[in-house]
Amino acid sequence: MNILIVNRYGDPDVEEFSYELEKLLHHHGHHTSIYKENLLGEAPPLFSGEHPPDLVIVIGGDGTILLTTQRMPVQVPIIGINYGEVGFLADIEPEEMSTFVSHLTEPLPLEARMRIELRINGQHIGTALNEALIVTDRPAKMLKFLIHINGNVAERFRADGLIISTPTGSTAYAMSAGGPIVDPRVEGFLMVPLAPFMLSNRPHLIDSSRTVSITLEATKPAKLVIDGQTEIHLETSSTIELSKSPSPALFIDAGQNFFEKINRKLRHL
């Protein structure tokens, strides 16, 4: 099996662990390469779309995993080894490495995680695994949002910002903003206003077969943030269109119960 190891850049403990993992994989007959992930600035794709690896092992936290999915020209199976603070996306702890590697000769069950395809005024600008965030450039300023679902006006409100999350991202920023935890097998858009002016503006869960468009009606400077990694300036009257991406992220299913894992992770926050 050809395996790409992606580790968090500049962390000596992570780098040492990645070399130990590489030696273990070689011992089991796998071919490996290591990519040191720099979380800052632009970077080339992790690999050629014509010759992708069979598996990507990410050593780090959720941020490293999110950036890895963005920098893959095609989606291949991912497994995360948690070297972050919480690691909702990482199913394996460092001490479980040997057991996982010993099972790589067996068929690996996959879990497809829905992603959001994003366009601004009709132009594709990115894909989100966790969430897309719309906020002002200046603190303590509100934006005015007009929401269309399948071309019909659904809501108009003012808020400090708006989170549009996948079920995977429901345990991230959306949860901190008061959104519900959503089973990742449920495919939908979770729309969570940030500090809305009216208390009646509550989170919505929208079926992924629908198309959602968000128009900024205010004149305040704003930006779109994708998975906490990419920032894009938004002009007044910009329309952000969201739809289900045809290319989901693929994760190795390590056999953990989702709700048990969430309960365990939240206890450590």
Swiss-Prot record:
Active site: D62
Reactions listed under catalytic activity: NAD(+) + ATP = ADP + NADP(+) + H(+)
Localization of this protein: Cytoplasm
Gene that this polypeptide is encoded by: nadK
CC per GO annotation: cytoplasm
Keywords: ATP-binding, Cytoplasm, Kinase, NAD, NADP, Nucleotide-binding, Transferase
The protein, known as: NAD kinase
GO BP field: NAD metabolic process; NADP biosynthetic process
Family under the similarity heading: Belongs to the NAD kinase family.
Residues passing through the membrane, by range: none
UniProt entry tagged with the keyword RNA-binding: no
